Structures are given as C-alpha cells and as structure tokens.
Amino acid sequence: MKQKRSFKIGVAGTLLTVGLLTAAFTTRTASESVRVMDRPDTESTNVNYVSYRAPLRPLNFIKLPVGSIQPEGWVKKYLELQRDGLTGHLGEISAWLEKDNNAWLTTGGDHGWEEVPYWLKGYGNLAYILNDPKMIAETKTWIEGVFASCQPDGYFGPVNERNGKRELWAQMIMLWCLQSYYEYSQDQRVIDLMTNYFKWQMTVPDDKLLEDYWENSRG
C-alpha cells in the first residue's frame, strides 16, 4: 500500500513538473515572433571586429581573428591531438617541407611550392590557437622566409615560370597564411608585403595573369 502511494505521488509530481514547463514554454513562445530572412542583416556595424569596407560588400558573417577564442574541453583536446599527430609532425616526414633548398627559404629552391602554404595555413592557426611556443617558432621560420623573399618590384616567394607566365597559385595560398599571422601578431610587414604584391599584380598583363590551369580554375 505504501509503495502504491509513493508511486502515485511520484507520477503526480512528474505531471505537475511537465505541466509547469509546458505552460512556461507556451507563454514564452507566445510573446516571441519569428522572422524568416534570406540572409543576416549587414546594415548594422560590428563594433568589435572589422568587416569589409566599401566598395566591397559587407560580410554576412565576420570571421573572428585567429587566437581570439581559447578552446576548452573536447575541442581543445582534439586540437592537441592534431598537434601531437600528423599535423604537428608533418615537417618531419614530408619531402615537400624539407627546409634544405626549399623554395620558400632559399632563392631558386627546387621544391616546396604550394605544398608549404597548404600545410602552414592549418599548422600556423593551430599554433596560434593553442599558443604553443614550439609551433609558433616553427611557423615564424617559414613566415620570415616569406618576408626575406620579397623583391623590389613587390613580388614574393618562389619564381616558377611557364612560357613567360608566372604561376601564382603558391602565393595565393601563402597570402592566407600571412593573413592569419597578421591576426595573431599585427606585424605591419604583412600589410606592406600585401600592398606591394598587389601593386605588382596590377602590372601583369591580363593575358599573363592566372593563365596556368591550376590557378586559373581557382583564382
């Protein structure tokens, strides 16, 4: 008899709780309105982060600067697994990341074209987000190599020409790496490099710009 009474009290308590939650939810949703839009509003200004300025179209979503958010919990754990796994150690096993005679570190190098920035984009971001001193130092080795490769006319990086036309795909990817590095460091050299490089690009005739298949299909 005592067990039946306890069971009835438990059921009544559960029903009462569900009823209260339902009433609260109904009251809340009744006072709210739902508006469907094709895309997020871009009229308002984000005071914390800079979006594109005119004449460029404002961004619907603003990418947060690398390192502005510190990961915790399982996200941090997975990033640490990347650091301790292939991403963090690819330089030890990849022929393309071999520093000796690498085209990003040595003028006239014979390897390491787009493969280096493909890897460095993720590796550098991982270093900044985890604030890992060893990885940051490795990243800066390559970034300093980029700065050292700058030429008086604004060009930077490996020189790879086909029929008098320079292949620019590797530089296009490295610009992403430099963007992340600037977000992390605010190093003015990044702005100077990009400004000079884009001025150089403006001097390239249209029939010689992005003519290679690989960069033309993506650039």
Report the location of each language-model feature.
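Bacterial N-terminal signal peptides that target proteins for export
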Residues: 2-14
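N-terminal export/targeting leaders of redox proteins
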Residues: 11, 25-28
